[in-house]
A protein has these predicted regions:
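Pyridoxal 5′-phosphate
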Residues: 1-193
Length: 193
């Protein structure tokens, strides 16, 4: 069995310390930590780079939900070394709904996918005979591909959005958002909200 532990919003707003305290707590070991790089409710940034080593020291897997950060904050999977990193394209990546991406570290690519598809198998192809030539899972992260992944219009839309972001740069986008947020904070400081 397993238990799900939720880290509740800390009174001081320091999500990183709250997550680190939860990891260090005595009790059942953490097996998998699913952590958003930017909290969805309050926009609080979570320093995944400082949390990852603590999880590795405990032998826990790290899944980074980059939904609210991909495209705005730089993410280097080589340095961060998460087991999994996921994000949809409909937020900051400027893509359509229904399209998402998942990075899977090589050490985790032998896992069993939740969705059992022909795309995730070694050799299942409607144009080939025999159709079910090799039903073993693909030896790479391709085994985790979704069914109906070849929706060409949404793939093109996602690609264009990512090309635009690559041209602008996550650092420049983040800096611009910082300027706008500071301006908003200054304007609201005089209001009685």
């Amino acid at each position: 069995g397993f238990a799900v532990e939720v880290v509740h919003r800390p009174g001081n707003g320091d999500w990183t310390s709250a997550v680190q305290e939860a990891i260090a707590r005595p009790g059942a070991p953490v097996s998998l930590a699913s952590i958003s790089s930017v909290h969805w409710a309050d926009g609080g940034a979570i320093d995944i780079a400082s949390i990852a080593p603590a999880l590795r020291a405990k032998g826990a897997a790290l899944l980074v939900d980059a939904t609210h950060g991909a495209g705005v904050t730089p993410i280097d999977v080589k340095t961060l070394d998460p087991d999994f990193l996921i994000f949809p394209t409909y937020k900051w990546v400027l893509g359509p709904y229904g399209r998402a991406f998942m990075y899977i570290a090589k050490r985790r690519q032998e896992g069993v996918p939740l969705e059992q598809t022909g795309f995730g198998r070694r050799a299942i192809a409607s144009e080939a005979a025999p159709y079910l030539k090799d039903t073993n899972f693909a030896p790479t992260a391709r085994r985790f591909d979704m069914g109906e992944r070849d929706h060409f219009i949404s793939l093109e839309m996602a690609a264009v959005g990512m090309e635009m972001l690559a041209e602008w740069g996550a650092g420049a986008i983040s800096a611009r958002l910082g300027v706008l947020t500071d301006r908003l904070a200054e304007g609201l400081a005089s209001e009685s909200l």
